[in-house]
C-alpha cells in the first residue's frame, strides 16, 4: 500500500464536543418543519392533511428522542466523555 492509500485508511477521531449544539439545532429545525407543515394544512386536501398530521407526529417523536440524546450528551460532556 502506498503512503497516499494508507492515509485514507485511518478513521477520523470521535469528536463529540459539539453534539449537544447539533442536536439542539436539529430540534429547532424540526419544530420549524412542524410549524410550516401546519401552516400548509390550510391549503391541503383531506388526505394530505392526514399525511401531514402523521408526519408531524413522527417529528414529535424525533424531537423527544433528540432531547433525550441531548441529556445523554450533556451528561457525557460533564463527565469528560468517560464511560
UniProtKB/Swiss-Prot annotation:
Note the InterPro entries from the entry: SASP_thioredoxin-like
The listed locations are: Spore core
Taxonomic superkingdom: Bacteria
The induction comment states:
Expressed only in the forespore compartment of sporulating cells. Disappears after 45 minutes of spore germination. Expression is sigma F and sigma G-dependent.
Annotated stretches, region: Disordered: 37-60
The record, for HAMAP family, names: Tlp
According to its UniProt entry, this protein's organism is: Bacillus subtilis (strain 168)
Q: Decide whether keyword Signal is in the record.
A: no
Q: Where is the composition biased (Basic and acidic residues)?
A: 46-60
Question: Member of which family?
Answer: Belongs to the Tlp family.
Q: Name one GO biological process term.
A: sporulation resulting in formation of a cellular spore
Q: What is this protein called?
A: Small, acid-soluble spore protein Tlp
Keywords (alphabetical) are:
Sporulation
Amino acid at each position: 500500500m502506498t503512503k497516499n492509500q494508507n492515509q485514507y485508511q485511518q478513521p477520523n477521531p470521535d469528536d463529540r464536543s459539539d453534539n449537544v449544539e447539533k442536536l439542539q439545532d436539529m430540534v429547532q429545525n424540526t419544530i420549524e418543519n412542524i410549524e410550516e407543515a401546519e401552516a400548509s394544512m390550510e391549503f391541503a386536501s383531506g388526505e394530505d392533511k392526514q399525511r401531514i398530521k402523521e408526519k408531524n407526529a413522527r417529528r414529535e417523536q424525533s424531537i423527544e428522542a433528540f432531547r433525550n440524546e441531548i441529556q445523554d450528551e450533556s451528561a457525557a460532556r460533564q463527565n469528560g466523555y468517560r464511560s
